[in-house]
Amino acid sequence: MKAVHRLGIGAAVLVILLDQISKPLMRDWLAGGDIYVAPFFNLVSAWNQGVGFSLMTMRGTSGPYVLSGVAIVISIGLFIWLLRSHRVLPVIGLGLAIGGALGNVIDRLSHGAVFDFLQFHAAGYYFPAFNLADSALTIGVGLLVIDGLFEGRGRSKTPATPEGQS
C-alpha cells in the first residue's frame, strides 16, 4: 500500500474517531437543552432518521438497516476508488467521505438514528442540524468535485504524437 493510500485511510479513521467521540460528549452537554452560541449558530440535540439533512427519512425497524447497507456498499465502492487513485486530493476527499459515511452508519446501527448537533441559521431560516461526519462527507465530496474540475488543467487535450509524424 502506498503512502497516499495510507493518508486517505488515516483521514477516514480520524473522521470516525472524532465523530464517535464528539457525539456522546455533545449528547451529554446538550442534555439540559439547546445552546445559543452566536447570532447565526446554535448547538442543538437532534436525531436524524434519514440521510443528510433528514432526507429520505425511513421510520420503522428496517429503515436504519436499509440506509446503513446502502452507505456501506457506497463506502466499499469509494474505498476501491481510493485504492485506485494515486493523487493526494481525491484520496483525502475519498477518505473524508468514507469516514463520514461510516461514522453515521455506526450511529444508525447503534441508536436507530444519527445524532446531529450543529445548526446554522440566518434571517429566520434554520439550516438542518448536522454533525462532524456530515461535515467530513461534504468536504470530501467537495474535494472530489474540485479535483474533477481542475485535474485536467495544464495537460494537453490532444494525444501526443511522436516527433516527425503529423
Task: Tell what function each PLM region has.
Residues 1-166:
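Alpha-helical transmembrane bundles and membrane-interface segments of multipass inner-membrane proteins
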